[in-house]
Amino acid sequence: MLLYHIVGASVLICLLNETAKAIIGVDECQATPVIHFLQYPGCVPKPIPSYACRGRCSSYLQVSGSKIWQMERSCMCCQESGEREASVSLFCPRAKPGEKKFRKVITKAPLECMCRPCTSVEEYAIIPQEIAGFADEGPFTTSAHFRRSSDLQ
């Protein structure tokens, strides 16, 4: 009976730990094996083993602790950290006279993967919700805390 409680408690702790990781947003970014199909017009596509960066990284948008009228954002993305190149020969049976039957193609793959800042959004690219028409309805317009700036006058 004691063993049953210990095993049950261990399973519960593991489940809670995984749930906490998902809620907190633990960084999980790694190089994952994939198969890429290299193609070139007139050549036979060739599958080659490669790597891709896959995973998730912590990101957030929140009200600033010191300036409540401003927002703080952190946007992290799973990206490559360095790259490697490989030269692969493709067979081209439909090569025109004078062209080679084999063509060298250069391909790239990530060397390592890590959470790095996403490309920044320029201020001019952000359209206020009032202009975009998104703030006309929804939970933020009916809340006493979130009113359109035109309603405050």
Swiss-Prot record:
This is Bursicon. GO terms for biological process: animal organ morphogenesis; chitin-based cuticle sclerotization; cuticle pigmentation; sequestering of BMP from receptor via BMP binding. One of its GO terms (cellular component) is extracellular space. Disulfide bonds join 29-78, 43-92, 53-113, 57-115, 75-118. Its main location: secreted. It comes from Apis mellifera (Honeybee). Keywords: Disulfide bond, Hormone, Secreted, Signal. It comes from the Eukaryota. Gene3D superfamilies: Cystine-knot cytokines. Residues 29-119 form the CTCK domain. The keyword Glycosyltransferase does not apply. One of its GO terms (molecular function) is hormone activity. Heterodimer of burs and pburs. The lineage of its organism: Eukaryota, Metazoa, Ecdysozoa, Arthropoda, Hexapoda. The keyword Signal applies. Residues 1-22 form the signal peptide.
